[in-house]
Amino acid sequence: MARNTPIERYRNIGICAHVDAGKTTTTERILFYTGLSHKIGEVHDGAATMDWMEQEQERGITITSAATTTFWRGMDAQFQDHRINIIDTPGHVDFTIEVERSLRVLDGAVVVFCGSSGVEPQSETVWRQADKYGVPRIVFVNKMDRAGADFLRVVDQIKNRLGATPVPIQLNIGAEEDFSGVVDLIKMKRINWNEADQGMTFTYEEIPADMQELAEEWRQNLVEAAAEASEELMDKYLEGEELSEAEIKEALRTRTLNNEIVLATCGSAFKNKGVQAVLDAVIEFLPAPVDVPAIKGVDENDNEVERHADDNEPFAALAFKIATDPFVGSLTFMRVYSGVVNTGDAVYNSVKQKRERFGRIVQLHANKREEVKEVRAGDIAAAIGLKDVTTGDTLCDQNAKVILERMEFPEPVIQIAVEPRTQADQEKMGIALGKLAAEDPSFRVETDEESGQTLISGMGELHLDIIVDRMKREFSVECNVGKPQVAYRETIRGTTEVEGKFVRQSGGRGQYGHVWLKIEPSEPDAGFVFVDEIVGGAVPREYISSVAKGIEEQMHNGVLAGYPVLDVKATLFDGSYLDVDSSEMAFKIAGSMAFKKGALEAQPVILEPMMKVEVTTPEDWMGDVVGDLNRRRGMIEGMDDGVAGLKIIRAQVPLSEMFGYATSLRSATQGRASYSMEFAEYGEVSKNIADRIIAERG
């Protein structure tokens, strides 16, 4: 079967933003203008098409990244059909994991900001994630009809707070209730969208006289940015020659793809103005799969290989999300990087080292699905019927095995105990938690060995609320929930050499395992690093992985208070064995014993999650807010001026001190202040707090 749309006309984009910037409404409008949804769904009516879980519609926030495929020919039907695969990403900070894994598989992004509140803490998080994956992006400043909306102020914040180089390609005409359209700075015309048909048609008109001067000034800025794309254009510009519209667009595209500039547009999705031009900008300025560097991976022999966006290369895809669908079971969302795969084909999961067969392949429009026979390089689709695939796994051709870069997922910071209400709920709860954990790598389930309780941990209170809510709705499991607990961790600060010897002699065959380990801190965030320095066969090859396994299992229970241990490097440098008595089990136990002994000698410490907190407050209450943060062991990192005389206080505060903060902030500031919080890093706790934690766990 031939390809319907050439890959050069594909755009895989994400729509990212912080909670209230109007991202879902923007996506809804995109679906409306591209002809996919005939009635515009409003978020505040709980009817948006992309938000397809019940909890999303109730809370008016997007939790899971729904993927959808649409086609666009341009506002003026000036292009051939382009296929746009859109991933709508959540804006709430507890779900940054969803954003992270979406950005991993996208080629470009549209970042939506609110015209009045501008760059908010969550926007910074999303921006940093997009920087990490080198995703080219354009900006849509939405809600220009809102009180306090100011396009150029937001552009300024993008420059100063995010360290980007924004280049406006539009200006707003009027703001707040007077917002009536935009000036296109490339064409130097006013765009007037027709309100009678919800903005489906438009006209170009002359720029209003009172805006002529401002438009000239920003047009100059835009041409200058374009000229910097090449020496040739710069010479032309400096000699006073006019750059043609095609030259300007080509130059802006080049610089956007190189992540040198970020083009800025504006509008109001709710008022049906501006989204149409954003779609044009996606086609003109964001990359096709062939415009981004080839994805790197490693083959079976650990050699680095690349996969190019080409149907003739071997098949390779990344599973970036697992979702449970009430009708078909498990859906595996994947981004195909190279090659072609048909329904019924056998493929290889190179991370799990297992074969899988594609039962059916569907392309989704929010939660409606359309079956397809095959998918090709550049496609985003979902496969039904894969047995054992986790987020981040690579699916590839059995004859050209490759592991694409793995995704990194954050450590959970908050933990609660859940217990089923009835015996019947007990079994169902196990199944439900297993499925939810497969969908979401930032959510973990474990059993407390001493109390036998089931503990679930995640990225924040809202994250766990939604998990409990989904157990009830999707799996009919009723459960009682304990008080949230902080997910402490342990690590070591010193270095030591230790011996672990396990000997058991009880008639017949005994057990014998003997190891010498050097235990030391690994690089921050490196996790567990195991180094094998055995020479001369002091420990036989076949037992070495057992030693590592023994250490790793022991790391689940730290020596101080039984919390998991982070960032340790263990070097196995000596040991001994007996031909008859040695076994994998004996060496596993020896490794575990040595680690336990070594961790006690290597200055063990307890770590606690430190949160990045931003409080926005009227100036009158600033002293109270700062005083309260200091009392909560917070470190004030800086203060900024917000909009409308508000102050923004940035601090790092231990999570353990932040429970109930929302209520206390409300009462301290008569409900005028708001805050946002996200995980920053693990920090060492002081001795007296460590003693208290150890005593509580006693």
Swiss-Prot record:
Q: Which HAMAP family does the record cross-reference, listed alphabetically? A: EF_G_EF_2_B
Q: Which residues bind GTP?
A: 17-24, 88-92, 142-145
Its annotated compartments are: Cytoplasm
Q: Per UniProt, what is one Pfam family of this protein?
A: EFG_C
Lineage, opening ranks:
Bacteria, Pseudomonadati, Pseudomonadota, Gammaproteobacteria, Vibrionales
Name the chain's protein: Elongation factor G 1
Q: Which GO terms describe its cellular component?
A: cytoplasm
Query: Which residue intervals define the domain tr-type G in the entry?
Result: 8-290
Matching NCBIfam families, A to Z?
EF-G (TIGR00484), PRK12740.1-5 (NF009381), small_GTP (TIGR00231)
Q: InterPro entries attached here?
A: EFG_II, EFG_III, EFG_III/V, EFG_IV, EFG_V, EFG_V-like, EFTu-like_2, G_TR_CS
- Can you provide one Gene Ontology molecular function annotated for this UniProt record? GTPase activity
What function does the entry list?
Answer: Catalyzes the GTP-dependent ribosomal translocation step during translation elongation. During this step, the ribosome changes from the pre-translocational (PRE) to the post-translocational (POST) state as the newly formed A-site-bound peptidyl-tRNA and P-site-bound deacylated tRNA move to the P and E sites, respectively. Catalyzes the coordinated movement of the two tRNA molecules, the mRNA and conformational changes in the ribosome.
At the top level, the lineage of the source is Bacteria
BP term (GO), one: ribosome disassembly
Q: Which family does it belong to?
A: Belongs to the TRAFAC class translation factor GTPase superfamily. Classic translation factor GTPase family. EF-G/EF-2 subfamily.
